[in-house]
Amino acid sequence: MPLPPLSSRTLLLLLLLLLRGVWIAISSPPAGLGPQPAFRTFVASDWGLTHLVVHEQTGEVYVGAVNRIYKLSGNLTLLRAHVTGPVEDNEKCYPPPSVQSCPHGLGSTDNVNKLLLLDYAANRLLACGSASQGICQFLRLDDLFKLGEPHHRKEHYLSSVREAGSMAGVLIAGPPGQGQAKLFVGTPIDGKSEYFPTLSSRRLMANEEDADMFGFVYQDEFVSSQLKIPSDTLSKFPAFDIYYVYSFRSEQFVYYLTLQLDTQLTSPDAAGEHFFTSKIVRLCVNDPKFYSYVEFPIGCEQAGVEYRLVQDAYLSRPGQALAKQLGLAEDEEVLFTVFAQGQKNRVKPPKESALCLFTLRAIKEKIKERIQSCYRGEGKLSLPWLLNKELGCINSPLQIDDDFCGQDFNQPLGGTVTIEGTPLFVDKEDGLTAVAAYDYQGRTVVFAGTRSGRIRKILVDLANPSGRPALAYESVVAQEGNPILRDLVLSPNRQYLYAMTEKQVTQVPVESCVQYTSCELCLGSRDPHCGWCVLHSICSRQDACERAEEPQRFASDLLQCVQLTVQPRNVSVTMSQVPLVLQAWNVPDLSAGVNCSFEDFTETESILEDGRIHCHSPSAREVAPITQGQGDQRVVKLYLKSKETGKKFASVDFVFYNCSVHQSCLACVNGSFPCHWCKYRHVCTNNAADCAFLEGRVNMSEDCPQILPSTHIYVPVGVVKPITLAARNLPQPQSGQRGYECLFHIPGSPARVTALRFNSSSLQCQNSSYSYEGNDVSDLPVNLSVVWNGNFVIDNPQNIQAHLYKCPALRQSCGLCLKADPRFECGWCVAERRCSLRHHCPADSPASWMHAHHGSSRCTDPKILKLSPETGPRQGGTRLTITGENLGLRFEDVRLGVHVGKVLCSPVESEYISAEQIVCEIGDASTLRAHDALVEVCVRDCSLHYRALSPKRFTFVTPTFYRVSPSRGPLSGGTWIGIEGSHLNAGSDVAVSIGGRPCSFSWRNSREIRCLTPPGHTPGSAPIVININRAQLSNPEVKYNYTEDPTILRIDPEWSINSGGTLLTVTGTNLATVREPRIRAKYGGIERENSCMVYNDTTMVCRAPSIDNPKRSPPELGERPDEIGFIMDNVRTLLVLNSSSFLYYPDPVLEPLSPTGLLELKPSSPLILKGRNLLPPAPGNSRLNYTVLIGSTPCILTVSETQLLCEAPNLTGQHKVTVRAGGFEFSPGMLQVYSDSLLTLPAIVGIGGGGGLLLLVIVAVLIAYKRKSRDADRTLKRLQLQMDNLESRVALECKEAFAELQTDIHELTSDLDGAGIPFLDYRTYAMRVLFPGIEDHPVLKEMEVQANVEKSLTLFGQLLTKKHFLLTFIRTLEAQRSFSMRDRGNVASLIMTALQGEMEYATGVLKQLLSDLIEKNLESKNHPKLLLRRTESVAEKMLTNWFTFLLYKFLKECAGEPLFMLYCAIKQQMEKGPIDAITGEARYSLSEDKLIRQQIDYKTLTLNCVNPEHENAPEVPVKGLNCDTVTQVKEKLLDAVYKGVPYSQRPKAGDMDLEWRQGRMARIILQDEDVTTKIDNDWKRLNTLAHYQVTDGSSVALVPKQTSAYNISNSSTFTKSLSRYESMLRTASSPDSLRSRTPMITPDLESGTKLWHLVKNHDHLDQREGDRGSKMVSEIYLTRLLATKGTLQKFVDDLFETIFSTAHRGSALPLAIKYMFDFLDEQADKHQIHDSDVRHTWKSNCLPLRFWVNVIKNPQFVFDIHKNSITDACLSVVAQTFMDSCSTSEHKLGKDSPSNKLLYAKDIPNYKSWVERYYADIAKMPAISDQDMSAYLAEQSRLHLSQFNSMSALHEIYSYIAKYKDEILVALEKDEQARRQRLRSKLEQVVDTMALSS
């Protein structure tokens, strides 16, 4: 059979297929496709769907949802529903409330299904949810009966994460007969690594209630079948998690595709941008210890774009063709994977996505190569999220094959190179979300779900000639606008695909062949399922086509489509039964017979002969109805119809043509068909014989009768004249036929004129006149027809027209008349001053009628009617437009005839309009003195009749400008500016330039020019230049400032609703440079804008634009708009903000108030409006602001997720209810409020009587109360008077004392600048805080050790720098009972000294310990406020030490000075009054316990002390008291003489004698005890100055101590008693330099006498409490506390203000404080502690109570000073006040409260406010970056590197290793991380070496 001739249509289809970009998406069916059939669906109206599985045998569908599990038939009919929630739960409850009561409030919690697996062997469904910490249910497959729900062990809790698509599992059936199955499950853990492993292998028992259900497959004390995310990883990257996207088993391996935070790209800073990476994870099925764990980065790349965010995957076998192309066996597996572009936005990834292909062979090969290289010892483990990622691979001789499953080393292992897939298909518009694939008859078909709810069908063909590896041949809608979720599953028979969105499951057929209605469309679709079933004329699968295996009955290639031709291809409608011959190609055996069918009109029999088909056309009678009303032809389909199937299976176009419809000769003979024109009959026919006269038959257009174009026909109205026409082939009318006529189709009055045929080529319309109505048209073109024999129209192919014209119409002036078309015979009649024909004008003289033909014609009396513009610059260049009459007929008439005053104005020829308009350019008028002038036009010459002057004068002006507004704008330009000045509308043309670039002109008036700024070159000022014609304007004082373009940093909140209108706070830079910024959003192809209000350069508030779209609306969980951005003048970069994650949520939906629309309500009853979407699930704290109006009155609102509770205003009557939120407004109906019903008369009487009685009782009570209160008032007034007197006395005393103290303090500190304060050096300061009471600590000394010991200690030091070892060491020590509080503090201090040079590392350890401590505190159900309150852990003491190290600089520069001033002030004030040397009590005190409670008489003496260093130097005056003991006087003298000298560098009072000099020779040594000492009844009183009768002004000296006779005799007893007391002090607390040695002088215990000084101490030893003898017990002396407090108030305030302030005289807040406070806030956030009191308390316990209180109570830790007991007592009161100020609890005070609390009761609220402000200010400060903190800590380490001997510190720490060696080694052995780092063996090495050396 010959090859068919390819029709043009077939060729076109082939060409399209070759050129087709195989990446197309068919969005709507093209012509020839049937409509998309409705798919079967299951709709879940209430709960969101999450997972779907299909039973491989029954085909039943199981769907997991929120709070539900559904069982559906294969056709999606609901069979069963099982309820799983909501449940009463709280995510914080671990274990769940069903197991153990929970302290957290429970609420109704949704249970989100996260895992749905079929257990075929046990005939059950495994469904795991999010509630109760992630427990699972087992459901019977038949009826979803709950078989079990294990929930009582920790193994039963998989994860409480609520995200549905983040968990994946593989169920591994047990060996046949054994029954035990395994579940491999991977899940994110949301930071709860202590509760949940991220990956685990669990037992699945046959009995659902078995206690071992979900137990780890293997577990011992060291390893188990699980993998946890290390807490260190989570502390560094709190957002780290692993999300499991897809899992599968292949051979003996289980694989997971995961998404996890990319720790290499993501900054640990929580505020930074998060990057994610996709990993493929592999485990051996039979590896219970997870030694085989390997993970590799996975992704693919296309055209330089990386796709790294895995969305879904599907394991499949390749089709035969694909397997061959990949070089695989057909039973090998491939993985189809969908990735989104980039590495950001895991939750809402970019729309651009790619479908990629991986072979499992390549994946296994990559993994094997990595394992082999590691076992060769190459590289590191490189698992970024495990601590041992830097651990090197260990060389091992093991043979690694494909089935290798790991050892206990070199694991877990991470891949370093990304496994790259083959990109098949890229979707840039819609975003792929799900994938499934299968092999159909050797072809690989992939189905991809999209974000818009479509299913793309893709054919994979790597050998495609176009070079594209995949063809998207069809796209069908599953559910418009809703993303397809991951579980895209094929039915068991592979006929259907189940696609799931959040609310619907759709059964999508894998093919829709039937939609294609032709072979070309069917096979052109490239759907591999579809072929053309020829004789059935249907597109179908091959198996659906009857006898498809027979030759040419089923076409599977476009070239196999049936081709059909017919001869002849057309017949006339008048012809009947014309024989037709049809030739067909690609047809099967037609022996069963065929018919010819002309569409559905008629059918004829056919005969098959010689491979051809013979049939006849229909009869003329049958054709008539087919062609009626169809014009000159009707194309019909001629079909071959099979007698076997009764179907039409091939077609060809066939034409019936109709000549008779043509009414003109040219139309007849120029057609496509063989028609003839009979010119004498004036008809068109297909039959030549129909023409009566042979010569009348026309076949060619040249022979047709027709009018030819000649000269134009101009006919003046009202003039009689003939019209001659040229023609061709004009027929001679035959006998009986009428002659020719001309038809003029004049509107309103058509004219028919007899015509005379001269010959076949000439015709004349006879004499006639013509007219038309009206004078508003000067000439009228009129259609002209020539007819003969009444209505036979001669063809007029050129549409020749006649022009009728009237001379006077619209030509009122001479100029207009003469400029008319010269072919009109119009001229100007001078006498009558009108336009007329020549013969209508009286002919007085030849010049009485002028015509344009006369070359010398010109009109008289030119006139100027208008000038534009009327002003211009003197520099000239203004184009002046002069409008008028008779302004010359030709340009030459006016070329030199226009002047403005004396200035020539040169006409522009191109803009000259004859007689009407002259445009001329004014010359330079700079020399012209006049300010204005008349415009003169002369036509040829300036004689009187040819000269015109303007009615207005033209003014010459000098334009200027003086202001531009706005004066600044963005560098990109686009700002509308107004330039203000004068005469700015002068001239004809204006051009503005800014910085040399044109400013786009808009409009101007005399005072302003508006233009749009161009882009600037650089930021800064740019000059403005205005060119008005030739005048150039500039003003150096007016400049336009270009600023940097505005930027947008943040939109808050980042969401709105469908209707927009919500307020958005936009922060950025340079925002105020744009006057009217607008915000824009594009959604679903529709763009809308809204306005913004700028507040300053960094803030503006915008109303969100609406995105209301009839075709699309955002889902409940929100959706990003296609674009969001800002219109900021011409700043293009802000039009689309790519970085914004702005979301739109649907509008609220409110229910009507009632079915009738009217709700009746009682007054004061709340109005409840129910609805949904009321609170969009947006992140952050922002909420939708509602306004509810009752009528026009707003009501008070309470908003919840499903209702608005409105406290209705006090209204009655009927009112409309309106709800507004942003741009959303809705009225749910009308509200009818009824007033309360009136009371009845008996009720009113009863109420009145009762009220009267009640009134009488109240009056009686009031009278009694009045009397009682009058007595109380008298008593109160009396007490008030007494208190006022007391207060005024105390105030006076305070005032005097403060003034005196200020003077003394000034004297003391006048020479104390910063350098004068005796600060201790860093080392001494640190030692006193770290090791209080130990003067000579080993860490200060060099240690002499053997070389091997030094080596061991060095190794031990390296171990301490391994975080895991150090943490294990500390935790193990703390777990020992014998490890005391003292030990804890000592270890903390030793560790900090050892790590002084590694402060960054020490900080990391401290943070981890604190994090653990917080966890422990919260787990043990302690109140969170107790955290850090005491020093019960190493961490707490380490924290104190950490602040000690890092705040030294701050103490020296800022806080030290007010602390030292307070210390000096207290010491000075105490020493102004008597101080008892024995009891330590004083007249002036802040402490009630140290207050002398009796009157002591004393005098102040001034002693003149000889300077002990320089005898000849002036004496130093020193104030003392006559009641002071000798030692007290010595102390005061030493303070005065050695003022400014550090205490440690001056003599001690005990080493000096006091010498009283009375004249040159008389010198008396004064002592506390000597022979003159008075003894009374066993009481011995110390000697005082009064005892020695020392007078005021006496001269004294301090001399080195001498031994007198008395001293020798008495020193033994006194020294014994003193030394005993001092040794008691030493053991109790502190070193010699720290002890409060004076004034405490110890009684002589052994001699039996009791010492006293000012008051006898009855509490001494054996005396009872309270028997105080002579002491007055009255509390009256407590007012002295108040006086002392008032005196010292300023110094306390100064200290507190310095400590609680963030700005200190140029010094910044120490980084350590900000860093630690931020850390505590992070911990609170992590544990969801939102109680501000708890956060406040943590900070107070951390810094003020742990560091500052210690420093305030012990200033000797910071300064080289001596602190006596009374100063110590006063500082303790200040420290207690400091502690109370930091507390959040209210102190309820009463008369029994301690005096020190009452003393500062009024001040504490003020101090508290300082503390709160301090904490708030710190919180507002920008976070410290890790880099800044690292640099700071490194600098601190460098500064103090060699302060302590680290070897000694290590030796001290090692003593604890030695003590608890076994426990530490066991702990290291148990810990998996420690085992991996081989820490135990390293420690054993240290222990062994140290043991040998000892």
Swiss-Prot record:
Residues 1264-1894 are cytoplasmic. SMART domains: IPT (SM00429), PSI (SM00423), Sema (SM00630). The keyword Transport does not apply. Ubiquitous. GO terms for biological process: dichotomous subdivision of terminal units involved in salivary gland branching; gonadotrophin-releasing hormone neuronal migration to the hypothalamus; neuron projection extension; neuron projection guidance; olfactory nerve formation; regulation of smooth muscle cell migration; semaphorin-plexin signaling pathway; T cell activation via T cell receptor contact with antigen bound to MHC molecule on antigen presenting cell. PROSITE patterns: SEMA. Residues 28-510 form the Sema domain. This is Plexin-A1. The gene is Plxna1.
